[in-house]
């Protein structure tokens, strides 16, 4: 895996507007891809999440959500530092778990990454939307936008359709 700074990615500041994530890119405040996708969720998906929250209770649902967010952030930090050739030593429980999960991605996914154009890249379509992705480059011979996802268990294909749209 080699670096090729083929593109200059814009800098951006993330901000909340009406409690929705937006990116300040140049002179534009653009809604995030995640914000747009959450606004287009099916009623079925929203109801499934609401049903799960009722089943486990609001306190447990919030705990699961926060743990997943913390774990995902730690995983992304570890992978970002790895890709940049920097080390990250986080001896907290979350950090140790993130390192374990990151090593799976490093061993099984990153060997097929041939070229890196950017890490933590802001991408946008002027006037419409913006987002940040973990990597841009050549993966398995194809130009690729790569976004790492954290999960404690395998996901069924029908549950991750938004990942592909993202």
Where are these regions (language model features)?
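Metal-dependent nuclease catalytic cores that hydrolyze phosphodiester bonds in DNA/RNA
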Residues: 1-130
